[in-house]
Amino acid sequence: MKTENQLSKIKPADRLASVSEYYFSKKLKEVAQMNAEGKDVISLGIGSPDMPPSESTIQTLCDAARNPDGHGYQPYVGIPELRRSFAGWYKKWYGVELDPNTEIQPLIGSKEGILHVTLAFVNPGEQVLVPNPGYPTYTSLSRILGAEVVNYNLKEENGWMPDFDELEKMDMSRVKLMWTNYPNLPTGANATPELYRKLVDFARRKDIVIVNDNPYSFILNEHPISILSIPGAKECCIEFNSMSKSHNMPGWRIGMLASNADFVQWILKVKSNIDSGMFRAMQLAAANALEAGEEWYEGNNKNYRNRRQLAGEIMRELGCTYDENQVGMFLWGKIPDSCADVEKLTERVLHEAHVFITPGFIFSSNGKRYIRISLCCKDDKLAEALKRIKGMR
């Protein structure tokens, strides 16, 4: 048995020094402790849909789980039924033709795809372009894997779009890939065909890979669009998608990526050495969910529209301004000039009103004057959060 002195000599890998524990991992522990103390915190932090998948999706899962032959390892590439359903979904809603056999790779949630893509494309010491503000995992996983993170700015005055004049002036000689995320997290900015055309042109001229993370395109968005709809995009782009947001299945961990056959095969070479596929019943249920019609998305969005109105009232009560044209499942707002520090504001709201709101600084420096409110909370809870905030001293 090792003594305490011996254990003290064991150190973690050096790569852990490049990252810290995920903000929400730490903060939700604090929220849980407050709840355990009877403080009843209303969480408006993370984007975890609180509505269920469709009834037919759940029924398909239950029926398939009863099949005694469905509990073994499944193909690394995903079952054909799921890949065909993803292809049909992209054709129906995005107008994009994908070969289900070679151009689609199901994922255990699109978050793991960040790891797989970085391992497949980026050598230690090479650079990746990451948006500021942006999803923190792009930065943390890049650093863990030895890549050098180079931020590019997204600013409110530019509609939270990349500044291509600024990008053109950057040294791209060591850049391997560029992360984009539209509809955007955390800002709610929506993509346009013009933006995607510029990104594809930029990638082709600079010989880099664009990875577009696209999980929010069905939330409060009348016109879903894929970067792969742009001619030539498959040659230089990878797109992630997820069933977590569009189909209310965050805990199922089912996502996908799409690109050209070579890129998909390189990623599969990594992925097949990391996991052993997904439970067959979940894949069949996901395939069922992808067959949903327009009424499914509209039913979700009716709820989100009501919630966004309440979130807007919370923003105004806090003196924040926001763009009413945002899409996705969050509301992003700018704090008033009279507020010196966004974290002090969100901490005050947490400890006085017992409402958890995300401070924008966690998405990097361009978010330091902003807050984000999740719409993944029922109307009565949002109304109660508003009431509590109005009652703050």
Question: Residue ranges of each PLM-predicted region?
Answer:
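Active-site phosphate-binding strand-loop segment of PLP-dependent enzymes
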Residues: 150, 154-225
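Conserved glycine-rich beta-strand-loop-beta hairpin in the small C-terminal domain of fold type I
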Residues: 287, 303-312, 322-334, 367
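Conserved PLP-anchoring active-site segment centered on the Schiff-base-forming lysine
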Residues: 120-142
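N-terminal small-domain helix-loop-helix segment of the aminotransferase-like
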Residues: 2-109, 116, 290-292, 393
